[in-house]
Design a protein with these regions (language model features):
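Short inter-helical turns and helix N-cap capping residues of alpha-solenoid HEAT/ARM repeat scaffolds
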Residues: 52, 95-96, 127-129, 155-160, ...
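Single-pass alpha-helical transmembrane signal-anchor segments
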Residues: 1-4, 103
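Structural detector for internal amphipathic alpha-helices that build alpha-solenoid repeat scaffolds
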Residues: 62-79, 101-112, 132-142, 160-172, ...
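N-terminal topogenic membrane-targeting module
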Residues: 7-96
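Amphipathic alpha-helical scaffolding segments comprising HEAT/armadillo-like alpha-solenoid repeats
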Residues: 44-47, 76-93, 113-124, 144-155, ...
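Long, contiguous interaction/recruitment modules in multidomain scaffold/adaptor proteins
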Residues: 8-15, 124-160, 167-168
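Extended, charge- and Ser/Thr-rich helical segments
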Residues: 261, 271-274, 280, 290
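Short amphipathic alpha-helical segments that mediate assembly, nucleic-acid/protein binding
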Residues: 27-28, 53, 57, 72, ...
Length: 294
């Protein structure tokens, strides 16, 4: 049994080393095609197996992930010429569940044409949430200018992880976005995306809108707006904030006040939110995050 384990371990390391060597070779070939202006993969004629085709697709995806303001047209021509999109679509059709989601995720990181976008549209209605979101990612990455309309048409709730992925796409594509229409949208996903944009990019001008959301006391958005206000280090000793925090359940309030303390707010800023019997605990909590320089 020990001998079998050693053989499997050695074989696994050998495959990883071989894949790394091939990926380096294929990446050099892709770069050569970009600089030479050709779409022929002349330097890797043996790339015929499905493993090799996936390695080339991963190289192209990593190249897109590692660059900003890259013209997608040359890479899109390479993808079409080498039929990497056809290969991935075939894999997506043949597999299901998380493996299908992984192929969709890989496809979302590559420049694809409108025909490919239409081919994955049906997967946005899958019962598997990972498949749904990865299919949506393909649509969004293909046309970032239509990101808001794609999310608006998406009929499922975006999780916080999925919202963070959308933010990553925005940063990668250096895509300008107006946060105010998002926050004021009737669509829940767009509102949460707007809050995420304000939080991620530290937009202090959104303070008035955030306070308005807190005052409206909408469960999910108001809690999110409170955390964003604290992240922006806004003044939180306001009547609307005090009223909202006072109406939170004890567990939510405790978590929020711990976050406020971590953001560097003083004990005085917390006084209006803290019940009398809990003041000693929160004063010691604030002191644990601050250094006495007296």
């Amino acid at each position: 049994m020990a001998g079998s384990w050693c053989v499997q371990r050695f074989a696994g390391r050998f495959c990883l080393r071989r894949d790394a060597e091939r990926r380096e070779k294929y990446l050099n070939s892709v770069l050569w095609m970009l600089f030479s202006g050709t779409e022929e993969c002349a330097h890797c004629p043996e790339a015929m197996s499905s493993r090799d085709r996936r390695l080339i697709a991963e190289d192209i995806a990593d190249l897109v992930d590692s660059t900003y303001w890259l013209d997608p047209a040359p890479l899109r021509r390479i993808v079409e010429r080498q039929r990497r999109d056809v290969f991935l679509l075939r894999r997506i059709r043949r597999h299901g569940g998380y493996r299908r989601a992984s192929y969709l995720h890989l496809l979302s990181r590559m420049p694809v044409d409108e025909k490919t976008v239409r081919a994955v549209e049906r997967y946005t209605h899958s019962r598997n949430r990972y498949v749904r979101f990865c299919a949506l990612s393909v649509q969004m990455m293909a046309d970032m200018s239509a990101l808001s309309s794609k999310i608006d048409a998406y009929s499922h709730r975006l999780s916080y992880f999925e919202l963070s992925e959308v933010l990553r796409m925005l940063r990668q594509n250096v895509q300008p976005v107006d946060y105010e229409p998002l926050i004021l949208s009737p669509n829940r996903n767009l509102r949460m995306l707007g809050l995420s944009v304000v939080w991620r990019f530290g937009i202090e001008d959104a303070e008035e809108i955030l306070l308005r959301i807190v005052a409206e006391n909408r469960s999910e958005e108001s809690v999110g707006a409170m955390y964003v206000l604290c992240t922006l280090h806004s003044v939180i000793t306001r009547p609307e904030v005090e009223k909202f925090v006072g109406g939170m359940n004890p567990v939510q309030r405790r978590v929020l006040l711990r976050y406020i303390a971590r953001q560097g707010y003083s004990a005085n800023a917390l006084q209006v939110f803290i019940p009398e019997e809990e003041k000693r605990y929160y004063v010691s909590l604030v002191d644990s995050y601050k250094l006495n320089v007296g």
